């Protein structure tokens, strides 16, 4: 087997190139390319795109799992934040198992935990959150065909100020 385990504790992605400026006036999220080294390595294993041709641009990473949501700007900054509010959520740690077994089965498991972020008056801008994804793919006939699955999960530690705005969990 060819399995690799990676872990990071309190990562600093300050050396990563910044995203281009963009003004998005739509109701839809802007998808940027992942550039953080921990998430770039082995990211192909976590790709599970849906409707690649008509609706979704599959080069952006948009699909069932989008790693840029891990460590993003606090979600409740618009509700409770001010100019001094943090621009990103701190990633406390993450671990990843990726690889391919001799029988053609590829596996990717990722788990990441982000810190709780307070705003003015100690209101929650982003609760402590756990992100998880498991992806498996079995190749057939030397890679001519495949069958795969993906399971994603988000679990948040909500408090009274964040509970009306965010889901406790999503799978």
Indicate where each model-derived feature is located.
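Signature for the C-terminal beta-barrel architecture of outer-membrane proteins
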Residues: 54-171
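Outer membrane beta-barrel
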Residues: 3-70, 90, 94-107
């Amino acid at each position: 087997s060819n399995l690799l385990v990676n872990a990071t504790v309190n990562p600093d992605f300050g050396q990563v190139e910044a995203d281009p400026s963009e003004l998005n006036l739509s109701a839809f999220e802007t998808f940027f390319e992942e550039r953080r080294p921990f998430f770039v390595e082995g990211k192909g294993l976590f790709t599970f795109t849906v409707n690649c041709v008509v609706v979704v641009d599959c080069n952006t990473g948009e699909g069932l799992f989008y790693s840029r949501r891990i460590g993003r700007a606090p979600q409740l900054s618009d509700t409770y934040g001010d100019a001094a509010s943090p621009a990103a959520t701190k990633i406390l740690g993450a671990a990843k198992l990726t690889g391919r077994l001799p029988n053609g089965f590829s596996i990717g498991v990722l788990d990441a935990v982000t810190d709780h972020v307070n705003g003015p008056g100690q209101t929650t801008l982003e609760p402590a959150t756990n992100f998880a994804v498991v992806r498996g793919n079995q190749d057939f006939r030397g890679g001519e065909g495949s069958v795969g699955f993906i399971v994603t999960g988000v679990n948040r530690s909500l408090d009274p100020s964040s509970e009306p705005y965010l889901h406790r969990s999503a799978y």
